[in-house]
From Swiss-Prot:
Chain residues that bind Mg(2+): 50, 90, 226
Protein name from the UniProt record: Selenide, water dikinase
UniProt record similarity statement: Belongs to the selenophosphate synthase 1 family. Class I subfamily.
GO-annotated biological processes: selenocysteine biosynthetic process
Catalytic activity: hydrogenselenide + ATP + H2O = selenophosphate + AMP + phosphate + 2 H(+)
EC numbers on record: 2.7.9.3
Species, as recorded: Haemophilus ducreyi (strain 35000HP / ATCC 700724)
Magnesium is among the record's keywords: yes
Pfam families: AIRS, AIRS_C
Cofactor dependence: Mg(2+)
HAMAP family named in the record: SelD
Highest taxon listed in the record's lineage: Bacteria
InterPro entries linked to this entry: PurM-like_C_dom, PurM-like_C_sf, PurM-like_N, PurM-like_N_sf, SelD_I, SPS/SelD
């Protein structure tokens, strides 16, 4: 029975496209309460980092994050695997190593059979096993739409933690996955994505960002984040604002997934692309329609955005090659300039 079910038809959003826009989220997070300060909380939500980081002594820190969303693909196992991979990415993006995870499941038990939920959980468990950790438990509720994700605990040496606020002018910018996930998954939700492209985007979303843990010990690695629902420009703007730098991006060097261009021409643009653009358009130089479609595209389980000092570029390229990870040079960071946009796109 579950083989004929299209999960994407049971949700109004898809993957990280479910995220609230950066502009609206800023309003939600405002508070009139006095802020409780814990000196052991090394990273909170002030700099839009990927996870919280807490000092536990002896030079070590616990990394804590959660991420969940509605179906981005139709297959339950693949949905669970992608959602789990996406949640684990926050730990890797901070430079940490995951320790364990617990599942978060919302499920319309009156609309879908329990075996579908079982396959979703199984996909999540598989991704955790690939990352070398256990899915230790979780919590489930009856919901109107399927929702799945993880709360993940990780660990890292404090000196290896990569913050959005630690990037420096002169750093080169690299991406570890091509863009276009939001475009292809929008085509899938509309029933227009070819089978080869379904497999291509699924495999990309299921790739763990373990390279983050391997790169973290390099002192020349100044900042790192994963590209998810706010698109490349949104997550890059978070680094630029937190670190008081500006960026120049070569849009022709930004790799896109094979086939994305044809789906852009067909109008397979997620609604979140425009919401993203409106949230940070004032920070970015003017964009062409194509640049907006690609650079503001909502990624689910996207790659890492890496800022690295020039003298270590060869090192990170060697590490990427050793583990078979993609690595694309897309731009550079500079000192702020009053006559320049926060992000210049060429």
């Amino acid at each position: 029975m579950s083989d004929n079910i299209r999960l994407t038809q049971f949700s109004h959003g898809a993957g990280u496209g479910c995220k609230i826009s950066p502009k609206v989220l800023g309003t939600i997070l405002q508070s009139e309460l006095d802020k409780f300060v814990d000196p052991k909380l090394l990273v909170g939500n002030e700099t839009a980092d990927d996870a919280a980081v807490y000092d536990i002594g002896n030079g070590l820190a616990i990394i804590s994050t959660t991420d969940f969303f509605m179906p981005i693909v139709d297959d339950p196992f693949d949905f669970g695997r992608i959602a789990a991979t996406n949640a684990l990415s926050d730990i890797f993006a901070m430079g940490g190593k995951p320790l364990m995870a617990i599942a978060i499941l919302g499920f319309p038990i009156d609309k879908l059979p329990a075996e579908v939920a079982q396959k979703i959980i199984e996909g999540g468990r598989f991704a955790c096993q690939q990352a070398g950790i256990v899915l230790a438990g979780g919590h489930s509720i009856h919901s109107m739409e399927p929702i799945f994700g993880l709360a993940v605990t990780g660990m890292a040496a404090i000196e290896h933690i990569k913050r959005n606020a630690s990037a420096t002018a002169g750093c080169e910018l690299f991406l570890t996955k091509p863009l276009g996930i939001g475009i292809l998954t929008t085509a899938e939700k509309r029933g227009l994505l070819t089978l080869p492209h379904q497999h291509l985007v699924r495999d990309l979303m299921c790739q763990l960002n373990t390279i983050g843990t391997l790169l973290a010990p390099l002192p020349e690695m100044t900042a790192m984040t994963d590209i998810t629902g706010f698109g490349l420009l949104g997550h890059l703007s978070e680094i630029c604002q937190a670190s008081n730098v500006r960026a120049e991006i070569n849009s022709h060097a930004v790799k896109v997934i094979d086939g994305v261009e044809e789906y852009v021409e067909q109008g397979m643009i997620p609604g979140g692309t425009q919401r993203n653009f409106e949230s940070y358009a004032n920070l970015v130089s003017p964009l062409s329609d194509r640049q907006k479609a690609i650079l503001c595209d909502q990624q689910t389980s996207g790659g890492l955005l890496i800022a690295v000092e020039p003298q270590a570029v060869e090192k990170i390229q060697q590490i990427a090659q050793q583990i078979g990870s993609m690595l694309f040079h897309i731009g550079k960071l500079f000192d702020r300039a009053p006559d320049k946009a926060l992000i210049e796109v060429n």
